Protein backbone atom coordinates (compact mmCIF):
# COMPACT_ATOMS: atom_id res chain seq x y z
CA UNK A 1 0.00 0.00 0.00
CA UNK A 2 2.80 2.45 0.90
CA UNK A 3 4.44 2.07 -2.53
CA UNK A 4 1.15 2.67 -4.33
CA UNK A 5 0.32 5.64 -2.09
CA UNK A 6 3.66 7.34 -2.76
CA UNK A 7 3.39 6.76 -6.50
CA UNK A 8 -0.13 8.16 -6.65
CA UNK A 9 0.94 11.31 -4.78
CA UNK A 10 2.92 12.07 -7.94
CA UNK A 11 0.48 10.89 -10.61
CA UNK A 12 -2.78 12.17 -9.06
CA UNK A 13 -3.97 15.12 -7.00
CA UNK A 14 -1.87 14.75 -3.85
CA UNK A 15 -4.51 16.21 -1.54
CA UNK A 16 -7.22 13.86 -2.74
CA UNK A 17 -4.91 10.86 -2.55
CA UNK A 18 -3.98 11.75 1.03
CA UNK A 19 -7.64 12.02 2.02
CA UNK A 20 -8.35 8.60 0.50
CA UNK A 21 -5.36 7.16 2.35
CA UNK A 22 -6.55 8.54 5.69
CA UNK A 23 -10.05 7.15 5.08
CA UNK A 24 -8.52 3.76 4.31
CA UNK A 25 -6.46 3.82 7.52
CA UNK A 26 -9.64 4.46 9.53
CA UNK A 27 -11.41 1.57 7.79
CA UNK A 28 -8.76 -0.84 9.07
CA UNK A 29 -9.94 -0.14 12.61
CA UNK A 30 -13.28 -1.70 11.77
CA UNK A 31 -11.68 -5.05 10.94
CA UNK A 32 -11.57 -7.85 13.48
CA UNK A 33 -9.96 -10.57 11.33
CA UNK A 34 -7.00 -11.04 9.00
CA UNK A 35 -9.34 -11.70 6.07
CA UNK A 36 -11.09 -8.38 6.68
CA UNK A 37 -7.76 -6.54 6.81
CA UNK A 38 -6.63 -8.18 3.56
CA UNK A 39 -9.85 -7.20 1.79
CA UNK A 40 -9.50 -3.66 3.11
CA UNK A 41 -5.96 -3.44 1.74
CA UNK A 42 -7.00 -4.39 -1.79
CA UNK A 43 -10.06 -2.13 -1.68
CA UNK A 44 -7.89 0.78 -0.57
CA UNK A 45 -5.23 0.13 -3.20
CA UNK A 46 -7.86 -0.04 -5.93
CA UNK A 47 -9.35 3.29 -4.86
CA UNK A 48 -6.06 5.14 -4.40
CA UNK A 49 -4.62 3.77 -7.67
CA UNK A 50 -7.74 4.97 -9.54
CA UNK A 51 -8.13 1.57 -11.21
CA UNK A 52 -10.03 1.78 -14.53
CA UNK A 53 -13.13 -0.35 -15.07
CA UNK A 54 -13.42 -2.92 -17.89
CA UNK A 55 -9.65 -3.22 -18.33
CA UNK A 56 -8.54 -5.53 -21.17
CA UNK A 57 -6.17 -8.03 -19.54
CA UNK A 58 -5.74 -10.74 -22.16
CA UNK A 59 -2.59 -10.61 -24.28
CA UNK A 60 1.18 -10.52 -23.95
CA UNK A 61 2.68 -7.99 -21.54
CA UNK A 62 6.36 -6.95 -21.37
CA UNK A 63 8.20 -5.55 -18.35
CA UNK A 64 9.59 -2.26 -19.66
CA UNK A 65 11.33 -1.59 -16.32
CA UNK A 66 13.69 -4.56 -16.62
CA UNK A 67 17.42 -4.05 -17.04
CA UNK A 68 19.39 -4.66 -20.24
CA UNK A 69 19.63 -8.39 -21.10
CA UNK A 70 16.89 -9.01 -18.52
CA UNK A 71 13.14 -9.03 -18.81
CA UNK A 72 9.74 -10.40 -18.07
CA UNK A 73 6.81 -11.48 -20.22
CA UNK A 74 3.34 -12.33 -18.92
CA UNK A 75 0.65 -13.90 -21.09
CA UNK A 76 -2.81 -13.41 -19.61
CA UNK A 77 -5.47 -15.75 -21.01
CA UNK A 78 -8.74 -17.54 -20.19
CA UNK A 79 -10.20 -14.46 -18.57
CA UNK A 80 -13.37 -15.05 -16.53
CA UNK A 81 -15.37 -12.90 -14.15
CA UNK A 82 -13.25 -13.74 -11.12
CA UNK A 83 -10.11 -15.39 -12.49
CA UNK A 84 -7.50 -15.30 -15.24
CA UNK A 85 -4.54 -17.54 -16.18
CA UNK A 86 -1.03 -16.05 -16.15
CA UNK A 87 1.91 -17.68 -17.94
CA UNK A 88 5.09 -15.93 -16.82
CA UNK A 89 8.65 -15.94 -18.17
CA UNK A 90 11.33 -14.05 -16.21
CA UNK A 91 15.05 -13.77 -16.97
CA UNK A 92 18.22 -11.93 -15.91
CA UNK A 93 21.11 -12.68 -18.22
CA UNK A 94 21.27 -16.47 -18.52
CA UNK A 95 19.24 -17.00 -15.34
CA UNK A 96 15.65 -17.70 -16.33
CA UNK A 97 12.50 -19.52 -15.29
CA UNK A 98 8.85 -19.93 -16.21
CA UNK A 99 5.77 -20.03 -13.99
CA UNK A 100 2.04 -20.56 -14.35
CA UNK A 101 -0.69 -19.36 -12.04
CA UNK A 102 -4.45 -19.02 -11.94
CA UNK A 103 -4.84 -15.48 -10.69
CA UNK A 104 -7.78 -13.89 -8.93
CA UNK A 105 -9.57 -10.76 -10.08
CA UNK A 106 -10.52 -8.41 -7.29
CA UNK A 107 -11.43 -4.73 -7.21
CA UNK A 108 -10.41 -4.33 -10.86
CA UNK A 109 -6.93 -5.75 -10.20
CA UNK A 110 -5.30 -9.17 -10.63
CA UNK A 111 -3.70 -11.01 -7.71
CA UNK A 112 -1.45 -14.05 -7.91
CA UNK A 113 -1.20 -15.82 -4.57
CA UNK A 114 -0.97 -19.44 -5.69
CA UNK A 115 2.05 -19.53 -8.00
CA UNK A 116 2.91 -23.07 -9.05
CA UNK A 117 5.81 -24.37 -6.89
CA UNK A 118 5.42 -21.50 -4.41
CA UNK A 119 2.62 -20.56 -2.04
CA UNK A 120 4.61 -17.65 -0.59
CA UNK A 121 5.04 -15.45 -3.68
CA UNK A 122 2.29 -12.88 -4.12
CA UNK A 123 2.07 -10.49 -7.08
CA UNK A 124 -0.49 -7.71 -7.50
CA UNK A 125 -1.10 -6.28 -10.97
CA UNK A 126 -2.66 -2.82 -10.98
CA UNK A 127 -4.07 -1.51 -14.29
CA UNK A 128 -3.37 2.13 -15.12
CA UNK A 129 -5.45 4.64 -17.06
CA UNK A 130 -2.57 4.80 -19.58
CA UNK A 131 -3.25 1.17 -20.55
CA UNK A 132 -0.15 -0.14 -18.80
CA UNK A 133 0.04 -2.46 -15.78
CA UNK A 134 2.11 -1.91 -12.64
CA UNK A 135 3.25 -5.08 -10.84
CA UNK A 136 4.15 -5.24 -7.15
CA UNK A 137 5.39 -8.37 -5.37
CA UNK A 138 6.52 -9.42 -1.92
CA UNK A 139 10.03 -9.52 -3.38
CA UNK A 140 11.75 -9.15 -0.02
CA UNK A 141 10.58 -12.61 0.97
CA UNK A 142 8.44 -15.02 -1.02
CA UNK A 143 9.04 -13.93 -4.61
CA UNK A 144 12.76 -13.28 -4.13
CA UNK A 145 13.21 -16.95 -3.24
CA UNK A 146 11.25 -18.05 -6.29
CA UNK A 147 12.63 -15.82 -9.04
CA UNK A 148 15.86 -16.50 -10.95
CA UNK A 149 18.92 -14.85 -9.39
CA UNK A 150 18.89 -11.13 -10.18
CA UNK A 151 15.43 -11.20 -11.79
CA UNK A 152 12.33 -9.32 -10.69
CA UNK A 153 8.69 -9.59 -11.64
CA UNK A 154 7.98 -6.05 -10.37
CA UNK A 155 7.75 -3.24 -12.89
CA UNK A 156 5.69 -1.48 -15.52
CA UNK A 157 4.19 -3.79 -18.17
CA UNK A 158 3.04 -2.79 -21.65
CA UNK A 159 0.95 -4.94 -23.97
CA UNK A 160 2.78 -5.87 -27.19
CA UNK A 161 3.44 -8.92 -29.36
CA UNK A 162 7.16 -8.04 -29.40
CA UNK A 163 9.48 -6.46 -26.84
CA UNK A 164 8.56 -2.73 -26.97
CA UNK A 165 11.73 -1.51 -25.25
CA UNK A 166 14.03 0.66 -27.39
CA UNK A 167 17.17 -1.09 -28.55
CA UNK A 168 19.89 -0.48 -25.98
CA UNK A 169 23.15 1.30 -26.79
CA UNK A 170 26.20 1.92 -24.64
CA UNK A 171 25.10 5.55 -24.52
CA UNK A 172 21.52 4.77 -23.45
CA UNK A 173 22.98 2.52 -20.72
CA UNK A 174 25.12 5.53 -19.68
CA UNK A 175 28.34 3.59 -20.09
CA UNK A 176 29.20 6.41 -22.49
CA UNK A 177 27.89 9.82 -21.52
CA UNK A 178 27.73 11.40 -24.96
CA UNK A 179 27.09 10.39 -28.56
CA UNK A 180 30.58 11.29 -29.79
CA UNK A 181 32.30 8.70 -27.59
CA UNK A 182 29.67 6.13 -28.54
CA UNK A 183 30.27 6.77 -32.25
CA UNK A 184 34.05 6.53 -31.80
CA UNK A 185 33.61 3.21 -30.04
CA UNK A 186 31.34 1.91 -32.81
CA UNK A 187 33.98 2.85 -35.38
CA UNK A 188 36.67 1.13 -33.31
CA UNK A 189 34.98 -2.23 -32.69
CA UNK A 190 32.72 -2.44 -35.77
CA UNK A 191 30.36 -5.42 -35.75
CA UNK A 192 31.50 -6.31 -32.22
CA UNK A 193 29.57 -3.32 -30.82
CA UNK A 194 26.37 -5.28 -30.24
CA UNK A 195 28.30 -7.98 -28.37
CA UNK A 196 29.49 -5.36 -25.88
CA UNK A 197 25.88 -4.19 -25.43
CA UNK A 198 24.75 -7.79 -24.93
CA UNK A 199 27.43 -8.25 -22.26
CA UNK A 200 26.28 -5.17 -20.30
CA UNK A 201 23.75 -6.99 -18.15
CA UNK A 202 25.55 -5.77 -15.02
CA UNK A 203 28.15 -3.01 -15.21
CA UNK A 204 30.18 -1.16 -12.61
CA UNK A 205 32.95 1.43 -12.47
CA UNK A 206 36.37 0.23 -11.41
CA UNK A 207 39.71 1.84 -10.65
CA UNK A 208 42.05 3.20 -13.32
CA UNK A 209 45.26 1.65 -12.01
CA UNK A 210 47.23 3.28 -14.86
CA UNK A 211 46.44 6.66 -13.27
CA UNK A 212 45.77 8.41 -16.58
CA UNK A 213 42.41 9.89 -15.63
CA UNK A 214 40.44 7.24 -17.53
CA UNK A 215 36.89 6.09 -16.96
CA UNK A 216 36.79 2.30 -16.56
CA UNK A 217 33.62 0.21 -16.76
CA UNK A 218 33.56 -3.58 -16.40
CA UNK A 219 30.49 -5.61 -17.34
CA UNK A 220 29.21 -9.16 -17.37
CA UNK A 221 26.17 -11.36 -17.93
CA UNK A 222 24.32 -12.79 -14.93
CA UNK A 223 24.71 -16.55 -14.81
CA UNK A 224 27.93 -16.36 -16.86
CA UNK A 225 30.06 -13.82 -15.01
CA UNK A 226 33.29 -15.76 -15.60
CA UNK A 227 32.69 -16.55 -19.27
CA UNK A 228 30.83 -13.56 -20.75
CA UNK A 229 32.49 -10.39 -19.58
CA UNK A 230 33.98 -7.19 -20.98
CA UNK A 231 35.78 -3.99 -19.99
CA UNK A 232 35.91 -0.51 -21.52
CA UNK A 233 38.45 2.15 -20.58
CA UNK A 234 38.46 5.61 -22.13
CA UNK A 235 39.88 9.11 -21.81
CA UNK A 236 39.12 12.27 -23.77
CA UNK A 237 41.39 11.05 -26.58
CA UNK A 238 41.69 7.26 -26.45
CA UNK A 239 39.67 4.09 -25.96
CA UNK A 240 40.71 0.60 -24.89
CA UNK A 241 38.32 -2.32 -24.70
CA UNK A 242 38.39 -6.09 -24.27
CA UNK A 243 35.85 -8.86 -24.23
CA UNK A 244 35.86 -12.54 -23.23
CA UNK A 245 33.32 -15.11 -24.39
CA UNK A 246 33.30 -18.80 -25.39
CA UNK A 247 34.23 -19.56 -29.00
CA UNK A 248 32.49 -22.15 -31.19
CA UNK A 249 34.31 -24.94 -29.35
CA UNK A 250 33.45 -23.61 -25.89
CA UNK A 251 36.96 -22.31 -25.19
CA UNK A 252 37.26 -18.79 -23.80
CA UNK A 253 38.34 -16.31 -26.47
CA UNK A 254 39.84 -12.87 -25.83
CA UNK A 255 39.26 -9.83 -28.07
CA UNK A 256 41.13 -6.53 -27.69
CA UNK A 257 40.55 -3.13 -29.29
CA UNK A 258 42.39 0.18 -28.91
CA UNK A 259 42.59 3.52 -30.68
CA UNK A 260 46.36 3.17 -30.16
CA UNK A 261 46.49 -0.14 -32.03
CA UNK A 262 45.42 -3.66 -31.15
CA UNK A 263 48.81 -4.93 -29.89
CA UNK A 264 48.04 -6.69 -26.60
CA UNK A 265 51.67 -6.21 -25.50
CA UNK A 266 50.89 -2.49 -25.15
CA UNK A 267 47.64 -3.06 -23.30
CA UNK A 268 47.12 -0.81 -20.23
CA UNK A 269 47.73 -2.45 -16.84
CA UNK A 270 44.06 -1.98 -15.97
CA UNK A 271 43.00 -4.27 -18.82
CA UNK A 272 45.94 -6.66 -18.40
CA UNK A 273 45.07 -7.32 -14.75
CA UNK A 274 41.38 -7.64 -15.64
CA UNK A 275 42.29 -10.28 -18.24
CA UNK A 276 44.27 -12.31 -15.69
CA UNK A 277 41.13 -12.81 -13.61
CA UNK A 278 39.66 -14.95 -16.38
CA UNK A 279 42.56 -16.19 -18.51
CA UNK A 280 45.89 -17.50 -17.26
CA UNK A 281 47.77 -16.18 -20.29
Each predicted region: which residue ranges?
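Amphipathic, heptad-repeat alpha-helical segments
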Residues: 1-18
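Contiguous, well-ordered beta-strand patches that form the walls/edges
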Residues: 18, 26-29, 90-133, 231-232
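Short, surface-exposed coil-to-beta transition loops
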Residues: 35, 68-73, 95-100, 117-124, ...
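Tryptophan-anchored aromatic micro-motifs
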Residues: 53-74, 116, 152-181
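N-terminal glycine/threonine-rich, aromatic-flanked beta-hairpin/loop signature
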Residues: 67-107, 183-209, 216-217
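Edge beta-strand at a domain terminus
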Residues: 99-105, 139-169, 263
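A short, surface-exposed interaction/processing loop segment used at functional sites
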Residues: 142-153, 234-279
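Exposed beta-strand-loop-beta-strand "reactive/processing" segments of non-cytosolic proteins
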Residues: 206-234
Amino acid sequence: MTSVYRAMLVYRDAGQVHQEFEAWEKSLGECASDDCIERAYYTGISRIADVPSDFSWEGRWWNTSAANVSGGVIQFSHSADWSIVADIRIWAGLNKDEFTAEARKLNGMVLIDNMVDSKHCKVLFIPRLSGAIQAYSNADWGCRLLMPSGAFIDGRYVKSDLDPRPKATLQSLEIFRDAKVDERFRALVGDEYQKFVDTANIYIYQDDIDNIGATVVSMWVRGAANTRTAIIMYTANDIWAARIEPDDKGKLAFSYFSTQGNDTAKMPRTLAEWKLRYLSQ
